[in-house]
Design a protein with these regions (language model features):
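Two-component histidine kinase catalytic core, primarily the HATPase_c
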Residues: 42
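Phosphopantetheine-dependent thiolation modules in NRPS/PKS and related acyl-activating systems
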Residues: 2-38, 46, 53, 57-85
Length: 85
């Protein structure tokens, strides 16, 4: 999976959790909770759906790394590569 494909998966999951989110103005380094008013339940659903969609286990202790688009890409890219390898 390329980084662009991974980004599309992440954005698709955001759309599911926050359909009103303006993804055109998404800032890669800004926290999702600040940009989309994610509640803690929304964030938990986001992380869980990413795990399901990607087939990659993400320990709860690592959820903090998924707080931004940049963090998601940094954390998930090597895991996707390892899974495919």
């Amino acid at each position: 999976m390329t980084q662009d494909e991974l980004k599309e998966v992440i954005l698709a999951v955001i759309r599911e959790i926050a359909p009103e989110a303006d993804l055109v103005r998404l800032e890669a380094s800004a926290k999702f909770r600040d940009q989309f008013e994610f509640s803690s339940v929304d964030f938990l659903n986001f992380a869980t759906r990413l795990q399901d969609r990607l087939g990659i286990p993400i320990p709860e202790t690592d959820f903090i790394q998924l707080a931004t688009l940049a963090g998601c890409l940094f954390y998930l890219t090597p895991k996707c590569i390892q899974k495919e390898g």
